[in-house]
């Protein structure tokens, strides 16, 4: 069962006071084989809520609705911008800062995941989640009223900080809202929420941008966020095991690891700026670009050293990353999810700039991808729950996605609708089917005390993948676009092309200039799609490593001969998880 995602925890996490009879009872061979996840072991150690504490009936339904409404907003902000970007570039006059519109949000969404994980561990869960929603709403308001690109980017960053608290807190709250055996089903509601946001995001963004104003893409967050908070406060009761850790205020603030957060943000900003400048305003071999890239490497090395010496104070605890399932899962999510967000940004640009369709129409054209993703993320969750296997789907999904993104690379000016519809369906299937699997594996292997930092650490890699991928795609797009213009439209000013919004090409350039500009845009988009192929290829390689991890970490309840192995052997195998 090399792909089984339910591996048992380290032996010292199990209550050693359990009697022999209880051990024999819990490990009785006549029971159906069931590998125990971290949550189950934590329950044995009284680290789980009792059955009576779990919400049921209407209370559970309303609580899940409230949490998923908040998650819907954070997810919608990841998808709604794609079809709105061409209109935003029209108003703010240029493409030069497009990568920041997405990266500012993703950078903070990922960079503050671990910080919020510590907040939920050391401060009251209910109040912390409310603050996260408030910060997100504040950032959305700033984006809505922004009169220039810089203010808009600041608003996106603030919304990202709040969004980090929402995504991290939602997972923790739902984990405390269901018994371990029912968590995959409950967590799948988040997958459905992602899907709904992915479906509605491009449509809402296009509709607001064309019929009203793109600013309503952010104003809409305010009433929905208020409703989510009202329902949450009415129906959520903090479980007894979710007590805040006993520590002084100074110790709690140290656990937030502000130095680590600043280093992470500094490194990400250096990398994004280097890609933004390179080949556009500065040559790749210029001192500015080289200095930023060298600075990025040095900051990342400093961050790694700082996190190591911080111990449990680190935003990325080293003891968690000693386990391959933690860092290998993070690497997989970095590349895999990054590919998806890249496509959500650049496919609408393809439809609006190359095909010349409206913002609403581009959202409709993007539906094959998001509808396919919605369907297959549900099927993927059901497959994991049915088979108790996760990693084989990660490998298969990334392989399918690699082929599908390769097909997207073949898109051209005159590609038929049948092809781009089919390609998107295939991409959605490959990327969505194993979308939640790394999280499923991780949450099955950590106890209740580590649920929050482990989950937020995984989200750190996942969301940063979006920031890095969008920036890398923008760099590839800009460089290829500028090079292609010298061939296809030598009489057109490259600066004018960069300063023109993607949906304004046909109104700015003459009939003689437009074909060359469109061809150059297509070359730039092909470069962006090539980045997506590379990302999902790296995800495929990391998924192979995840399979090897599961092969040696899964604890079989029986030996090769079918005989019961017993507790002593299991303890030895659990110890092996921490020395490999």
Curated annotation (Swiss-Prot):
Name recorded for this polypeptide: MFS-type transporter thnB
Membrane topology label: Multi-pass membrane protein
Gene: thnB
Any single Pfam family the record assigns to this protein: MFS_1
Residues bearing carbohydrate: 285
Family under the similarity heading: Belongs to the major facilitator superfamily.
Region (Disordered): 1-33
Chain segments annotated as coiled-coil in the UniProt record: none
Compartments in which it is found: Membrane
Functional note: MFS-type transporter; part of the gene cluster that produces the tetronate natural products trihazones.
Record's keyword terms, sorted: Glycoprotein, Membrane, Transmembrane, Transmembrane helix, Transport
Composition skew (Polar residues), residue ranges: 14-25
């Amino acid at each position: 069962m090399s792909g089984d995602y339910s591996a048992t925890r380290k032996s010292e996490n199990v209550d050693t006071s359990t009697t022999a009879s209880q051990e024999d009872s819990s490990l009785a061979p006549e029971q159906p084989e069931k590998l125990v996840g971290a949550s189950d072991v934590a329950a044995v150690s009284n680290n789980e809520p009792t059955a009576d504490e779990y919400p049921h009936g209407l209370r559970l339904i309303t609580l899940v609705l409230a949490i998923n409404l908040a998650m819907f907003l954070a997810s919608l902000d990841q998808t709604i911008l794609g079809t709105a970007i061409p209109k935003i570039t029209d108003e703010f006059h240029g493409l030069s800062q497009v990568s920041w519109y997405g990266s500012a949000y993703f950078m903070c969404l990922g960079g503050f995941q671990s910080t919020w994980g510590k907040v939920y561990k050391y401060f009251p869960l209910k109040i912390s989640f409310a603050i996260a929603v408030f910060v997100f709403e504040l950032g959305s308001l700033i984006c809505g009223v922004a009169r220039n690109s810089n203010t808009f980017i600041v608003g996106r960053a603030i919304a990202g900080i709040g969004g980090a608290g929402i995504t991290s807190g939602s997972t923790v709250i739902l984990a405390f809202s269901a018994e371990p055996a029912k968590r995959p089903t409950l967590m799948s509601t988040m997958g459905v929420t992602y899907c709904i946001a992915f479906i509605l995001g491009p449509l809402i963004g296009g509709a607001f941008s064309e019929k009203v104003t793109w600013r309503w893409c952010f104003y809409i967050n305010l009433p929905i966020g208020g409703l989510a908070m009202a329902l949450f406060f009415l129906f959520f009761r903090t479980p007894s095991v979710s007590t805040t850790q006993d520590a002084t205020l100074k110790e709690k603030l140290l656990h937030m690891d502000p130095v680590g957060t600043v280093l992470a943000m500094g490194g990400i900003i250096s990398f994004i700026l280097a890609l933004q400048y390179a080949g556009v305003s500065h040559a790749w071999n210029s001192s500015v670009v080289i200095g930023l890239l060298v600075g990025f490497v040095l900051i990342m090395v400093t961050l790694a050293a700082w996190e190591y010496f911080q111990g449990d104070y680190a935003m990325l605890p080293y003891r968690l990353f000693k386990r391959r399932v933690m860092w290998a899962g993070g690497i997989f999510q970095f590349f895999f999810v990054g590919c998806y967000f890249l496509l959500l940004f650049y496919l609408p640009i393809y439809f609006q700039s190359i095909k010349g369709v409206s913002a609403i129409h581009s959202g409709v054209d993007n539906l094959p991808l998001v509808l396919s993703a919605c369907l297959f993320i549900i099927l993927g969750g059901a497959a994991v729950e049915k088979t108790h296997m996760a990693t084989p789907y990660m490998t298969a999904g990334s392989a399918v996605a690699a082929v599908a993104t390769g097909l997207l690379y073949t898109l051209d000016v005159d590609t038929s609708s049948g092809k781009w519809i089919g390609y998107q369906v295939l991409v959605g299937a490959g990327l969505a089917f194993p979308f939640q699997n790394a999280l499923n594996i991780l949450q099955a292997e950590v106890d209740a005390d580590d649920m929050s930092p482990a989950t937020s650490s995984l989200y750190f890699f996942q969301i940063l993948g979006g920031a890095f991928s969008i920036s890398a795609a923008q760099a590839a797009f800009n460089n290829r676009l500028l090079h292609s213009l010298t061939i296809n439209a030598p009489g057109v000013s490259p600066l004018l092309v960069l300063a023109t919004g993607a949906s304004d090409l046909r109104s700015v350039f003459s009939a003689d200039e437009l074909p060359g500009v469109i061809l150059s845009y297509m070359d730039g988009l092909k470069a962006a799609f090539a980045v997506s192929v590379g990302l999902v290829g790296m995800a495929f390689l990391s998924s192979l490593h995840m399979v090897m991890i599961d092969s040696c970490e899964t604890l079989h309840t029986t030996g090769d001969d079918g005989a019961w192995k017993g507790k002593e052997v299991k303890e030895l195998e659990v110890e092996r998880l921490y020395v490999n």
